[in-house]
């Protein structure tokens, strides 16, 4: 599958809208696009999936490793892959959009805010193209997609100012319908506030989609890793919370779980009973927006009983919050949670951690064997007040974790981390492979 990267000059330049317009242009032209996102984000991919009904691939060399990132890419489907970048093209060094483009050998199309410039837009693009050589990054900046650019003289001025080796791939017109509302943690999820399809189709008309398709190329393939235990998926069942409170799930995680087990979704917000399963996974999301439903629905109480019975439970970020004793919102409302892990969670007005992280296991748990390392990402607005009997699974090699030095609160065969892990990280292998009595 061939593809290209839509990279921005900075955060806030309009990469997500440009990506959605490009995906729309591909569909309108008869292609089946595969969306992807550079970096660890959950929210932008939700907009990709809401638009084209295809899960967006998470491409991050820190989370998955170089080979894991390539495997993640090649598990995609469709005619052509559109990779939305993260922040500005070169921001983030080892985890930058440039690092993803280099690791996959994909051409880069630069999204430049052209609202108040013409020749300066070309100068910006030229500088970004030449900067790759300056820092020794092997990427091709193929051209630009002009964001917030009018037609006529404005578009012509940008096109004419570009050097011959930088292609003008079109523009995204300034339109009030192409704005996505945001909140803490970023934009609203795609299922909540997707852009109007007609507005995207209008924007897509000013993109030279065939020229973009001609620019795309395929990354080098990599051998797949066969990790099945030999048991059929039907032999094991994993209950996975999936609703508006638990919506931060990398597709690679579900793929990893499905490779070894039958995945049984359930909704704690709706008060669903927990499916009969060998393990339970609570991903991140927005439990703070659903405190009353989680407190009264009964699902968390049922999870607490399963945890006390020794069923392995793995919670990430929002999952950690749900497994705690209580959750207090920024409005001061406090809700009882599952009460499995000895912590009280309180939401803060600003983020408490944002970074790629690395953890080293202190002991055997459902997430790792002793001494193993796990890489992931943390981004949260909550803080934990710990009980005196708090026990941790991981020491922090990089990042903040729960208390600045540790992550992974444990009790029974349950673990709750602020760290989000990719399906290629190895974090879910032990959850699937080891019976609870052996942990």
From Swiss-Prot:
Residue numbers annotated as active site: 317 (nucleophile)
InterPro entries, per the entry: CbiA/CobB_synth, Class_I_gatase-like, CobQ/CobB/MinD/ParA_Nub-bd_dom, GATase_3, P-loop_NTPase
UniProt site positions, description: Increases nucleophilicity of active site Cys: 420
Keywords tagged on the record: ATP-binding, Cobalamin biosynthesis, Glutamine amidotransferase, Ligase, Magnesium, Nucleotide-binding
Enzyme Commission number(s): 6.3.5.11
Region (Disordered): 214-235
Single annotated GO MF: cobyrinic acid a,c-diamide synthase activity
GATase cobBQ-type domain segment(s): 237-428
Broadest EC class assigned to this enzyme: ligase
GO BP annotations listed: cobalamin biosynthetic process
Function: Catalyzes the ATP-dependent amidation of the two carboxylate groups at positions a and c of cobyrinate, using either L-glutamine or ammonia as the nitrogen source.
Domain remarks in the Swiss-Prot or TrEMBL record: Comprises of two domains. The C-terminal domain contains the binding site for glutamine and catalyzes the hydrolysis of this substrate to glutamate and ammonia. The N-terminal domain is anticipated to bind ATP and cobyrinate and catalyzes the ultimate synthesis of the diamide product. The ammonia produced via the glutaminase domain is probably translocated to the adjacent domain via a molecular tunnel, where it reacts with an activated intermediate.
UniProt miscellaneous comment: The a and c carboxylates of cobyrinate are activated for nucleophilic attack via formation of a phosphorylated intermediate by ATP. CbiA catalyzes first the amidation of the c-carboxylate, and then that of the a-carboxylate.
Protein's name according to its UniProt entry: Cobyrinate a,c-diamide synthase
Organism this protein belongs to: Haloarcula marismortui (strain ATCC 43049 / DSM 3752 / JCM 8966 / VKM B-1809) (Halobacterium marismortui)
Native organism taxonomy: Archaea, Methanobacteriati, Methanobacteriota, Stenosarchaea group, Halobacteria
Gene label: cbiA
């Amino acid at each position: 599958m061939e593809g290209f990267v839509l990279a921005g000059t900075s955060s806030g330049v309009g990469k997500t809208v440009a990506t959605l317009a490009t995906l729309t242009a591909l569909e309108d032209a008869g292609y089946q696009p595969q969306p992807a996102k550079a970096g660890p984000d959950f929210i932008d991919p939700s907009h990709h999936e809401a638009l084209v009904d295809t899960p967006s691939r998470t491409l991050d060399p820190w989370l998955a490793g170089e080979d894991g990132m390539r495997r993640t890419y090649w598990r995609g489907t469709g005619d052509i892959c559109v990779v939305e970048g993260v922040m500005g093209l070169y921001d983030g060094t080892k985890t930058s959009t440039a690092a993803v483009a280099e690791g996959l050998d994909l051409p880069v199309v630069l999204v430049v805010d052209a609202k108040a410039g013409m020749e300066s837009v070309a100068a910006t693009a030229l500088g970004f193209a030449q900067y790759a050589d300056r820092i020794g990054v092997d990427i091709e900046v193929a051209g630009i997609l002009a964001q917030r650019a009018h037609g006529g003289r404005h578009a012509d001025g940008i096109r004419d100012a570009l050097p011959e080796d930088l292609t003008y791939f079109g523009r995204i017109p300034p339109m009030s319908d192409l704005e996505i509302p945001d909140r803490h943690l970023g934009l609203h999820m795609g299922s909540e506030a997707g852009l109007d399809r007609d507005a995207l189709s209008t924007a897509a008309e000013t993109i030279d989609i065939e020229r973009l398709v001609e620019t795309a190329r395929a990354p080098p393939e990599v051998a797949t890793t066969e990790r099945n235990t030999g048991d059929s998926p039907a032999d094991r069942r994993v209950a996975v919370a999936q609703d508006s409170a638990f919506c931060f799930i990398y597709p690679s995680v579900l793929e990893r779980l499905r490779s070894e087990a039958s995945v049984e979704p359930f909704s704690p917000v709706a008060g669903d009973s927990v499916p009969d399963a060998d393990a339970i996974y609570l991903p991140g999301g927005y439990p703070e927006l659903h405190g009353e439903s989680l407190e009264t629905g009964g699902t968390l109480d049922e999870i607490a009983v399963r945890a006390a019975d020794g069923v392995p439970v793995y919670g990430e970020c929002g999952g950690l919050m749900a497994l705690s004793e209580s959750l207090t919102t920024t409005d001061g409302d406090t809700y009882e949670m599952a009460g499995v892990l000895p912590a009280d969670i309180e939401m803060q007005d600003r983020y408490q951690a944002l970074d790629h992280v690395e953890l080293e296991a202190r002991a055997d748990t459902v997430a790792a064997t002793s001494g193993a390392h796990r890489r992931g990402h943390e981004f949260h607005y909550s803080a934990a007040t710990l009980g005196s009997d708090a026990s941790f699974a991981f020491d922090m090699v990089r990042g903040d974790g729960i208390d600045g030095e540790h992550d992974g609160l444990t009790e029974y065969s349950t673990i709750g981390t602020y760290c989000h892990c990719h399906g290629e990280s190895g974090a879910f292998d032990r959850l699937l492979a080891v019976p609870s009595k052996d942990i």
